[in-house]
Structure formats: structure tokens, C-alpha cells
Design a protein with these regions (language model features):
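Structured alpha-helical subdomains that flank or immediately precede key functional sites
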Residues: 1-207
Length: 207
């Protein structure tokens, strides 16, 4: 991956991920009323955010407030990210192989099918009227958008991550085993308290 980055930096070229076509009819989307093709564009990060050093936000303090949900029902994934940011931000930072770079090439590591997978991304994001339509940052950081895009690419499309499991998301983000409890289960309250006491990441999601 480092050789790939060095190639684009040396040749001063912008990386374009051919596996993920930047069109509203590409593999990222399924037709839906909120996705109007004439308004929907993939804009590169530099045209959406002001140019700042460390725009991924990884060299700065990560906070849950950096995460804003957009027009996609992936709160299960975003809430899992928020929980990690709250308690173990260093684990989240380790998911990114590269920091901000002019080539627009990024690699996000996610745990999938029992092993870590490296998801190669460019810095084009779905936008409407020049603003991200899905996950949004609190400022100029793009780390939230990159994580969501990696999750979408892993599953084949943004549409396919519309609704899901917090447990699945946490496993992908940490590679650690997770347990699921329903609120009506007799041992749920005890399990939550034990989780907090042991320093485990605890999330709650509805359906």
C-alpha cells in the first residue's frame, strides 16, 4: 500500500478508485426518492472542505461530536464509532494507514470474515448541493466519512449499510469478540454494568 501511495505522490497524480464508480447509478446506490440523480454528485474532499493539515483529524483530539448522521440509517455503525472515540480513540486511529495527502489515497483497515482487510479509498464523497449527504463531520475532518465509505465499500454499496447491527460494526472496528443482549433479557442490566466495570465498549441501538 505504501508503494501505491509513493507512486501517486511522486507522479503528482490524484488517485481514483475505479472499483467504486462516482455516479449516482454506480454500485454505491439503489434508487431511492432522497437520491435524485440530477442533484447527486461525488465531490472530492478538497472541494467540500477547506484545505487544512491533518484534515483526517487523526492528529487531533477525536470526539463523539465529530460524528453527524446523514440521510442513511447507519446509526448502528456511527454509534459504534462514537463509543470507540469516547473510550479508545487510539484504536480508531490505528484503522487508518495514511494521514491527509494530496493524492487523495486512503486505506482503512476493517475486520472481516476472521481477518483484517485493507479497504482502498479515494477522497470522493456523495454530495448534494456541494455538501455530504451521508455522514457529516463537525468541522473539516473527513475521518468519519472515510470510515463510512470503507464500510459501504466492504458491503458493496451505501444502500446496503442502511440499517444493521452494532455488534457487527464493533467487530469490524476492533476485531474483538462481542456479545449481544436484548433489553428484555434477565441478565442485560448485569451485563451492561459488568461491561462498564471491565472497560468494555458498550453500545445501545434500537430497531
Amino acid at each position: 500500500m505504501l508503494d501505491l501511495l509513493e507512486f501517486y505522490l511522486k507522479n503528482k497524480e490524484t488517485f481514483v478508485d475505479d472499483e467504486t464508480p462516482a455516479t449516482s447509478k454506480g454500485q454505491y446506490l439503489h434508487a431511492k426518492d432522497i437520491f435524485k440523480a440530477k442533484y447527486f454528485l461525488f465531490n472530492i474532499a478538497s472541494s467540500v472542505f477547506s484545505r487544512e493539515r491533518n484534515r483526517t483529524g487523526l492528529a487531533q483530539l477525536l470526539e463523539p461530536k465529530d460524528i453527524i448522521q446523514g440521510s442513511l440509517g447507519d446509526c448502528y455503525f456511527l454509534s459504534s464509532i462514537a463509543s470507540l472515540v469516547e473510550y479508545y480513540p487510539e484504536l480508531l486511529s490505528e484503522l487508518f494507514m495514511f494521514d491527509i495527502n494530496p493524492s487523495g489515497l486512503y486505506v482503512v483497515r476493517l475486520f472481516n470474515d476472521g481477518e483484517w482487510s485493507s479497504i482502498v479509498l479515494d477522497d470522493r464523497f456523495p454530495c448534494v448541493y456541494g455538501k455530504p449527504i451521508f455522514a457529516k463531520p463537525h468541522g473539516n475532518e473527513i475521518w468519519v466519512l472515510l470510515l463510512e465509505k470503507a464500510w459501504a465499500k466492504l458491503h458493496g454499496s451505501y444502500q446496503s449499510i442502511d440499517m444493521g447491527s452494532s455488534m457487527e460494526a464493533l467487530i469490524a472496528l476492533t476485531g474483538a469478540p462481542c456479545k449481544f443482549y436484548r433489553k428484555e433479557d434477565d441478565d442485560t442490566r448485569k451485563a451492561i454494568q459488568e461491561g462498564f466495570d471491565s472497560g468494555s465498549v458498550v453500545t445501545c441501538s434500537g430497531s
